[in-house]
């Protein structure tokens, strides 16, 4: 059986990503990136380096990269839509403009990443992964090894919930506090939190923010082991 590593928000921090991928290679893990791979909000940023590392991990380690809110905004920029280039996106744009990366190829790659991933661990526990929230409205068929959920399987409302998370009139819904009665484990990044419980994993060590407390989170699924890369 294949073993997976769930990797939280990266936000253009090359050194931590490199450490995480070295761990995956040594432990024979398939990385599943939970999104927000670009847009650093600190003084360190290498969006192009992160992109190249991830593309290499796709080839060598069969890595999976999920859609997210930050990537969605970059996609809209690359398609020519008017957006506010803030929260680190301005840095990402500038770094790619000053690189040799083909922007059309970059757009095609970003636009074709799946919104969700479903797989089982060695104990037959199912993991349902999305950047912010795996909608219960998604029907998961029988599958072998891993099932990916792509854009053409979803309507706009569900896509938005998967990359931004559910909201109500009072704001963001903290779904992990109430949504505990299901036979699978929900996995996300996005929330600037680290939560490891029987019913959910939230893996966002605030990588890309300033401070000594921030880290890139990796969860080795079969070992049930959290790794922090500083």
Describe these PLM feature segments.
Residues 1, 26-30, 60-62, 124-126, ...:
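A general structural motif
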Residues 1-51:
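N-terminal active-site segment of His-dependent metallophosphoesterases
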Residues 7-8, 31-35, 64-69, 130, ...:
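Active-site neighborhood of phospho(di)ester-bond hydrolases with catalytic His/Asp-centered motifs
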Residues 12, 38-39, 71-72, 133-137, ...:
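Short, solvent-exposed loop/turn segments at secondary-structure junctions
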Residues 17-18, 42-46, 75-78, 132, ...:
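A short acidic (Asp/Glu
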Residues 40-128, 151-156:
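Active-site neighborhood of divalent metal-dependent phosphoester bond hydrolases
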Residues 165-229:
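Conserved beta-sheet core of the metallophosphoesterase superfamily
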